[in-house]
Every structure is written in structure tokens, then in C-alpha cells.
């Protein structure tokens, strides 16, 4: 017969007693682990800011949150965006845009482009899987989008990779648990 305490003795301590591991570390080890964690976070932020500069988009990577663009993109697809202002917007192009009063950007296809005599361009969008255009999504009284509304244009995608983000937003406790485990792993990981 195996006692419960005997089973725990064979498991790595970091999986059972995080605070016990922290107490066993000397101050230098703890400082090193915190610094290591800070380096990982700051590196991720620098990469993100670099992508913003390289792509010209305030959000160079987005996740498709609905099925409105099927069959082109499915819920959970990860899109890579660019937003170079000098490129003209064309009908058939897939854009990500923000509408005043809505927090979440929308991924839809440009179906009509209207150019005024003064050079201003306005355009209309629609989800591939939607019956009607997006005028019902725009702010009240707005019939067309302008270039200033565009967050980016879809240049590539990875299918279903963004489902992790959707799951974490749908189940916030899972998100916090995953972040806590990853943070604890980085802090408690020891060099071999």
C-alpha cells in the first residue's frame, strides 16, 4: 500500500509547492528568475512594437471572431495585416476596420469603392457569409468607410491558431490559470 505522502515525494517540488520552491531559492537565484521573466515580457513587447512599425498597422495580428467571412476565413483563424497608407483600397480586398462606438475590429471584404473628384476614397464592406452589406454595423448616419477607419488589410493567415485566444476570452478563469502556470514556470525554472 502506498501512502499519499510517498507519492508526492517522487513528484517534482515545483508542481506541488510553488511557495516552498521560492523559499528554497537564495536571493540571487530569485533575482535572476525575476529578471529572466522581465526579459521575456520586454522581448515580447519589443517584437510586437517592431511588427507595428514594419506592417504600418496598429494591430498587425488579429483573430477572426465570427463566421461572417466563411468560407474565406473561419472563426479562430489568425490574420496577418499590413496597412500602408499609400496603397489604394480595391474592391475584393479583405480589410479589418474599426467603427466608432465598437471596441472590436471587424474583418470583412470591400465590395464597392467610391472615389470623389477631390481624391477622397470611400468604400463599402460586407462579410462573405452575410446577406447584406455592413451599413447596419457602421455608426448611425454613416454609409461608407474611409481609409482612417482601416486597421489593416489581410495579407496571410494561419487556420484556427487563434482559437486559443477565443477560448481564453470565453473562459477567463482558464486564461488566468494558464498565465499563472506560465509565470510560475519561468520564475521557478532552474538551470541544469
From Swiss-Prot:
Effect in UniProt of substituting residue 68 to A: Loss of catalytic activity
Top-rank taxon, per record: Eukaryota
Keyword Acetylation recorded: no
Cellular compartments annotated: Endoplasmic reticulum membrane
Catalyzed chemical reaction(s): Cleavage of hydrophobic, N-terminal signal or leader sequences from secreted and periplasmic proteins
Record-level Gene Ontology MF annotations: peptidase activity; serine-type endopeptidase activity
Membrane-side (Cytoplasmic) residue stretches: 1-28
Spans within the Lumenal topological domain: 49-192
Membrane topology: Single-pass type II membrane protein
Residue ranges crossing the lipid bilayer per the database entry: 29-48
GO cellular component, one term: endoplasmic reticulum membrane
Keyword Transcription regulation: no
EC number, as in UniProt: 3.4.21.89
Disulphide-bonded residues: none
UniProtKB keywords: Endoplasmic reticulum, Hydrolase, Membrane, Protease, Signal-anchor, Transmembrane, Transmembrane helix
Active site annotation, chain numbering: 68, 108, 134
One Pfam family named in its UniProt record: Peptidase_S24
PROSITE patterns xref list: SPASE_I_1, SPASE_I_3
Post-translational modification: May undergo processing at the N-terminus.
Entry domain remark: The C-terminal short (CTS) helix is essential for catalytic activity. It may be accommodated as a transmembrane helix in the thinned membrane environment of the complex, similarly to the signal peptide in the complex substrates.
Subunit structure: Component of the signal peptidase complex paralog C (SPC-C) composed of a catalytic subunit SEC11C and three accessory subunits SPCS1, SPCS2 and SPCS3. Within the complex, interacts with SPCS2 and SPCS3. The complex induces a local thinning of the ER membrane which is used to measure the length of the signal peptide (SP) h-region of protein substrates. This ensures the selectivity of the complex towards h-regions shorter than 18-20 amino acids.
Protein role: Catalytic component of the signal peptidase complex (SPC) which catalyzes the cleavage of N-terminal signal sequences from nascent proteins as they are translocated into the lumen of the endoplasmic reticulum. Specifically cleaves N-terminal signal peptides that contain a hydrophobic alpha-helix (h-region) shorter than 18-20 amino acids.
Protein name stated in the entry: Signal peptidase complex catalytic subunit SEC11C
Amino acid at each position: 500500500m502506498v501512502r499519499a505522502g510517498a507519492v508526492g515525494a517522487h513528484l517534482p517540488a515545483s508542481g506541488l509547492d510553488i511557495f516552498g520552491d521560492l523559499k528554497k531559492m537564495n536571493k540571487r537565484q530569485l533575482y535572476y528568475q525575476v529578471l529572466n521573466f522581465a526579459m521575456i515580457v520586454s522581448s515580447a513587447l519589443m517584437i510586437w512594437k517592431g511588427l507595428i512599425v514594419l506592417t504600418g498597422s496598429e494591430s498587425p495580428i488579429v483573430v477572426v471572431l465570427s463566421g461572417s467571412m466563411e468560407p474565406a476565413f473561419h472563426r479562430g483563424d489568425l490574420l496577418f495585416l499590413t496597412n500602408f497608407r499609400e496603397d489604394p483600397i480595391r474592391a475584393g480586398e479583405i480589410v479589418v476596420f474599426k467603427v466608432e462606438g465598437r471596441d472590436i475590429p471587424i474583418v470583412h471584404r470591400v465590395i464597392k469603392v467610391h472615389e470623389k473628384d477631390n481624391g477622397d476614397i470611400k468604400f463599402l464592406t460586407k462579410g462573405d457569409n452575410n446577406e447584406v452589406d455592413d451599413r447596419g454595423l457602421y455608426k448611425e448616419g454613416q454609409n461608407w468607410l474611409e481609409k482612417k477607419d482601416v486597421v489593416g488589410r489581410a495579407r496571410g493567415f494561419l487556420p484556427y491558431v487563434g482559437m486559443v485566444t477565443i477560448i481564453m476570452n470565453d473562459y477567463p478563469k482558464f486564461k488566468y490559470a494558464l498565465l499563472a502556470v506560465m509565470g510560475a514556470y519561468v520564475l521557478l525554472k532552474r538551470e541544469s
